[in-house]
Structures are given as C-alpha cells and as structure tokens.
C-alpha cells in the first residue's frame, strides 16, 4: 500500500544552535565557504538551527556588534528552498525576539554580490540595500552588498 504524500512529509523544526550544525551544512553543501569564519560568527550571539528529520538545513543568528547594533547571518543548505515561507516566518519571529531582548535599533546583513536569490530574500525580510558593493569584504576577498534594517523604517519588525 502506497503512503500518501502528507503522511511522509516531514516538517522543519527549530532547535537551539550548535556549532556542529553549521559544520554539517558547510561540509555537505558549501565546501567553498570558510568554516572558521562561519564558526566564529555562529558562536558570537543568539542563533537557531532549522532541521528536517535528522538533517540541519539552515542556521541563522545575530552577532552583537556593539550596543544597539546586530549583524545578522545565515548559512543554508540547498534543501531550504522547499521551506522558504516557513523559514521567512521563523526568521522574522527570531529577529523580533532578538531585537526586543537586546534593545537593538539596527540590524545589518551582507550577501554575496552575485547572489540575487539571497538579496531578494533580505528585501522580503525588510532589509534595504545600502547601495554600492563592498569589494574584498570577506576573508576570502569576495564582494558583498550590505543591507540594513533600522528602527523607524516602515519595514522595522517591531
């Protein structure tokens, strides 16, 4: 007897972040990404991991740069695309909690200059492109676009 599609579908879950979660994603889906830099970022503030079954599919967090300012980061696997709406809702709730708990007035995020999918997602999340390209920004000298989300903006999540 064949199983129905809904009976076999596994919904994502959120768990507290563990450094090993990001390591699994990087080893599996992003071998070109600098694991040391990612681990330092991931261990420097509140973070969560999205899981489907026994596999992490994404990690996200906020590094507290200085009082009132956070730097948002995210590392995702290719599997995350199937859960985009869920991820957006969970991440918005996470950012609201972090903003409230830490008294933030500004969030920043960077995305690779050639990654239009993630640029569009940051826009959906309410971040606004600051304009221009920051060349040589990452440890491996890749260029990024900087995005901001500032208290008082119409997209501020509070």
Regions found by a protein language model. Name each.
Residues 83-99, 120, 124:
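Conserved acetyl-CoA-binding loop-helix of GNAT-fold acetyltransferases
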Residues 64-74, 104-105, 143:
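A conserved beta-turn-beta hairpin within the catalytic core of GNAT-like acetyltransferases
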Residues 104-123, 136-137:
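Conserved beta-strand-loop-alpha-helix junction that forms the acyl-donor binding cleft
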Residues 2-26:
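A short beta-loop-alpha structural element at the N-terminal edge
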Residues 110, 128-144:
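Conserved catalytic-core motifs of GNAT/GCN5-like acyltransferases
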Residues 68-87:
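Conserved acetyl-CoA binding element of GNAT-fold acetyltransferases
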Residues 45-60:
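Conserved beta-hairpin
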């Amino acid at each position: 007897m064949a199983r129905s599609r809904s009976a076999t579908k596994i919904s994502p879950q959120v768990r507290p972040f563990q450094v090993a979660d990001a390591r699994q994603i990087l080893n599996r889906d992003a071998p070109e990404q600098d694991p040391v830099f990612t681990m330092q970022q991931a261990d420097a503030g509140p973070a969560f991991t999205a899981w489907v079954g026994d596999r992490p599919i994404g990690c996200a967090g906020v590094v507290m740069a200085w009082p009132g300012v956070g730097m948002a980061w995210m590392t995702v696997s290719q599997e995350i695309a199937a859960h985009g709406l869920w991820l957006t809702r969970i991440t918005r709730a996470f950012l609201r909690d972090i903003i409230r708990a830490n008294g933030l007035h500004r969030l920043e995020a960077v995305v690779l200059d050639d990654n239009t999918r993630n640029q569009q997602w940051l826009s959906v999340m309410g971040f606004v492109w600051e304009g221009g390209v920051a060349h040589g920004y990452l440890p491996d000298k890749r260029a990024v676009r900087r995005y901001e989300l500032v208290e008082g903006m119409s997209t501020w999540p509070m």
